[in-house]
Regions:
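Acidic/His- and Gly-rich active-site-bordering loop/insert found
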Residues: 10-113, 118, 122-143
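Histidine/acidic-residue-rich, glycine-tolerant segments that coordinate divalent metal ions
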Residues: 69, 91-93, 100-112, 118-119, ...
Length: 490
């Protein structure tokens, strides 16, 4: 039997520790912003996070599941075991001067934290530090594990970790993501596979002896044409994207002996992605057969659909509401206003999307009343029905292993588009720092709710069991597939 007073005291202990250690967390976030390392190359960023974990008394293990930059920091003993997920990879080609209200590239072609993962990883670390303090002070049984999860951007790092059993023993997992709005996520996302199709032909003089050539590029184009016809005959929520990554050279007078295309196949469930994948493979093989070329199918990565746990999401939402949004300085609001207005009319889209999914008219009106604000300081209404995202996240693979929930917290100006120079510019600002501390406290608070009241985890597990309906986790990544850094030869 838990006592509410103990829960509130425990939260205050954690929140005070988070405030006390905020300076070192801001330093770590800003340093990771400066490293801006892309998927599976995050060695410096990993060291920054691991150094803080070691200094705070966590037991650190690296190279989890044979993923070089995957790690964890553990504190405590016994049940429940709660995981806090952190990310720290950047995006290629998004270098940007910090604090600027216009696009200013400092190092052309360099990477940048256009998705705010410098904040994501450090806020989760801050939450783990707060939880550790609570466990020490309360003397209660329980374990907190901070997971350093690399390669979220295009690498599905957590899926590789899940394949290695990294999350199998967790009772619950919590994470968050930076954004322009604050809300508890109750929705789902699409599972996906990323696959390279490599066509091998035979070169020849395109004018003098075209009959001797077998064009790999012809095969690739025929494959793409076949997939275009397939699109009508898959589930409506499916998405099939592609990028031609090698056309066989720059000489039109040569029959191209090699060509390559990268496909990203999405659908609501892993089984649907697998079905579409097999059909795409047949199209690729048919294209090769038509052109007397050869195709090699190279599976790059995959991730599962997200199953947001509404029981834990509600705990996150309650803590976000209890804490309330940060207060910003006049200078910070001036900066936010310049960024938000610079986005243009599209800055209202995220707000309007939230309002559209409010069933209660009063709640919808309340959300829309914030239109025109430079920084959204309200918590979006809790939506138990959830909204399907047509994107994908490797948090999905964690959610198939244990009850998992995530929050979105405002860390940048209203309407800021993700994966943009505007996100990078705001990544070291007061907006970012205050938002990540808000997120850290909400995650720590939700975790303490679960340590103090075992019934919460019991209900979360019951919800997950009902959602699975007898299904079990099967990692979408096949045996032998290894994580690949961006730009690594396929």
């Amino acid at each position: 039997m838990y006592r509410k007073g103990d829960m509130e005291m425990g939260k205050q202990t954690a929140w005070e520790e988070i405030d006390k250690k905020s300076s070192e967390i801001f330093t770590a976030s800003d340093e990771i912003w400066g490293c801006a390392e892309t998927a599976f190359t995050e060695d410096k960023s990993m060291k920054i996070l691991c150094d803080v974990l070691k200094a705070e008394g966590f037991t650190v293990d690296t190279g989890l599941a044979d993923v070089k930059t995957a790690f964890k920091g553990t504190f405590g003993s016994g049940k429940p075991v709660i995981g806090i997920l952190g990310e720290f990879d950047a995006l290629s080609g998004l270098d940007q001067e910090a604090g600027a209200t216009e696009k200013i590239v400092v190092h052309d072609g360099a990477s940048g934290h256009g998705c705010g993962h410098n904040m994501l990883g450090t806020a989760s670390l801050s939450a783990a530090i707060g939880i550790k303090k609570y466990l020490e002070e309360s003397g209660k049984p329980g374990t907190v594990i901070y997971f350093g999860c690399p390669g979220e951007e295009g690498g599905s790092g957590k899926a590789f970790m899940a394949k290695g059993g990294v999350f199998a023993d967790l009772d619950a997992a919590i994470t968050w993501h930076p954004g322009d709005l604050t809300q508890a996520d109750t929705g789902s996302s699409l599972a996906n596979y990323q696959v390279a199709y490599k066509f091998y032909g035979k070169s020849a003089h395109a004018g003098g002896a075209p009959h001797l050539g077998r064009s790999a590029l012809d095969a690739l184009e025929l494959m793409n044409m076949g997939v275009q016809f397939l699109r009508e005959h898959v589930v409506p929520e499916a998405r099939i994207h592609y990028a031609i990554t090698n056309t066989g050279g720059y000489s039109p007078n040569v029959v191209q002996p090699y060509a390559e295309v990268l496909y990203l196949i999405r659908a609501p469930k892993n089984s649907q992605v697998e079905e579409i994948y097999q059909r795409v493979n047949k199209i690729a093989e048919g294209a090769a057969h038509m052109t007397e070329t050869r195709v090699e199918i190279d599976f790059v990565k995959g991730c599962s659909n997200l199953m947001s746990n509404k029981v834990i999401a509600k705990e996150l939402w309650d803590n976000l509401v209890e804490l309330g949004a940060p207060e910003y300085t006049e200078e910070e609001m001036k900066f936010a206003k310049a960024i938000s207005e610079g986005v243009g009319d599209s800055r209202f889209e995220s707000l309007e999307k939230i309002a559209k999914n409010c069933k209660d008219k009063a709640a919808k009106a309340e959300v829309l009343s914030h239109k025109g604000e430079s920084m959204y300081r309200f918590v979006a209404p809790f939506n138990p029905d959830g909204i399907m995202s047509f994107g994908s996240t490797d948090v999905g693979d964690v959610s198939w292993n244990c009850p998992t929930a995530q929050a979105y917290v405002a860390t940048w100006a209203a309407g800021t588009p993700g994966h943009s120079w505007q996100v990078v510019s705001q990544g070291k600002s007061g907006l970012a720092h205050k938002g990540l501390i808000y997120a850290a406290k909400a995650m720590a608070g939700a975790a303490i709710d679960m340590y103090e009241d075992p019934e919460i985890i019991a209900k979360a597990k019951a919800e997950m069991e009902e959602e699975l309906d007898g299904d079990t986790y099967h990692c979408p990544i096949p045996d032998g597939c290894k994580p690949r850094a961006i730009g690594m030869k396929m």
